[in-house]
Amino acid sequence: CTMILSDLGARVIKVESPNGGDDSRKFGPFIKENSAYFMSLNRGKESIALNLKNSEDKKIFLNILNKTDVLVENFKPGTLEKWGLGWKDLRDKFPKLIYASASGFGQTGPLKELPAYDMVVQGMGGLMSVTGHPQTEPTRVGTSIGDITAALFTTIGINSALYDREKTGKGMFIDVSMLDCQIAILENAIARYLSKNEIPQPMGSRHPSIAPFEAFKTKDSYIIIAAGNDKLFEKLCNALDMKAELNNEKFKTNALRCKNMDELKLIMEKKLKVLNTKDWTQKLEKDKIPCGPIFNIKDAVENPQIKARNMIINTFHKVAGDFKAAGNPIKMSSYADSLKRGDVPDLDENREKIIKEFCS
């Protein structure tokens, strides 16, 4: 959340525990004993270490809040309240403050006091139940989607609250639950359950409601083909020399193609296995059929399209040195999308500067 806000121009002061700082400082991989994981998410921020149970440090924190637009916290609900720093404690002192809380289960409900990590909410939110293949053990999504979606929704909430404050002059409290965010992104799966009482199952790469829309074997690997409507299916049949299938009643509509997708996939893969993925991608792209290879991380990062979009940026840490990280996908016409981003702070690196500015 705060990385996105920093990329969009916000000044971000990261308040960390004096006892080792943010947990992610200890997560690998490491560059000269510094976490590349932490550094990639905290470029361009400032760091101050405060023990919020300590009266002097708490006073510093309140002085910072006096000149702050937004407070973002992700403690277990009730933690900051114990220290006299909850929303109800602060809203009268700082009436313009936007106070954003992101937690595992939110500030209300029977589970509100429980701790959570990304994988816990992936499991409880239903996402893992539709990920992977049938008859395999539960599969985690390959990235921390529970953390990421909560960060994105919190960022949207903060920007909405800032806009509202322009009209009302008042701050507000934002409550985002990681579990809620998993429910919010279930799209087709939750629509199927709520409308038809069907419990969706994992389907590998196949889309449950659009066909053909999955990964197919080629001569050397796999290709993603996403023929999302009848016109695209017609183009695909022509490109694959499948004119008989175009007129086959089993494949006349999207609903019928979904019903008979196993049969259609066998036919398509017989055609696709004569060429490699690169050749098929070039051929189908000429026909404007949505398709693409399945890249590993190296291939994805080295993709000229990614480089052209400044999606791999440069930053710096005084011990680790220069290193690269993922960039900002939000491109705005009024702001430069620089390849060079702000430095990564050591724990408590900016203490003197921050205290001088906010406490003098």
What residue spans do the PLM features occupy?
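Oxidoreductase and adenylate-handling cofactor-binding alpha/beta cores
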Residues: A151-G171, A184-S195, C237-A244
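Conserved PLP cofactor-binding pocket of PLP-dependent enzymes
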Residues: E285-R309
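Flexible, small-/acidic-enriched active-site or ligand-binding loops
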Residues: F316-S360
